[in-house]
């Protein structure tokens, strides 16, 4: 058989084995796989993936440049709370002795001027009848009339004491002030627990008296002593208003 006849016979055999449906679509047997094709063109970029975990820290970089200039001073802060009181220090060394006061001419001049001013003031007040000097005592009044306790407080605040005569001369000085102001004067003494016995405010016993005849006769009910304008004394209650006279 020639090659052409053999080929034709095979063709008919293949055609005879093919089944066709009424739609004239024939289903052939799977053919032999062809050779792989060439690579296609690159596809488009895909979507961004999910964020990954942080990587490990990188190595330390090289040193930086030179440090900058110092900045300006800031504003002062608020004062802090006071600290605790420290311990008392040791006494310092004794200083050199100073010059005697009588050698300081400037000090002597100042003292002389002060003394002169005091004497002038005392002279003016004496002329007004509000102050009298007897020995080393000075008796003075501000012209107010108040009770015994108030007079005592006023005199203490002024640096003195309520006036009390301890000699006839002092008694006369206080009496002249009482007569000038036409008012009785409380004296700086008070009755003891024993009626008729009196003592000074410092606790000492009275060593000079000038009672009006028949006085004292308060029988313990009149604890204070007043001076009349003629200089005589009388025991009296301490709540009356009398001229305030102090002694310095």
UniProtKB/Swiss-Prot annotation:
Residues 31-99 are annotated as: Disordered. Residues 69-82 have a biased composition (Low complexity). GO terms for cellular component: collagen trimer; extracellular space; multivesicular body. Ca(2+) binds at residues 215, 217, 234-235. It comes from Rattus norvegicus (Rat). Disulfide bonds join 155-246, 224-238. Residues 42-51, 84-93 have a biased composition (Basic and acidic residues). InterPro entries: C-type_lectin-like, C-type_lectin-like/link_sf, C-type_lectin_CS, Ca-dependent_lectin, Collectin_CTLD, CTDL_fold. Pulmonary surfactant consists of 90% lipid and 10% protein. There are 4 surfactant-associated proteins: 2 collagenous, carbohydrate-binding glycoproteins (SP-A and SP-D) and 2 small hydrophobic proteins (SP-B and SP-C). GO terms for molecular function: carbohydrate binding; metal ion binding. This is Pulmonary surfactant-associated protein A. Residues 1-20 form the signal peptide. Residues 28-100 form the Collagen-like domain. Belongs to the SFTPA family. Residues 54-65 have a biased composition (Pro residues).
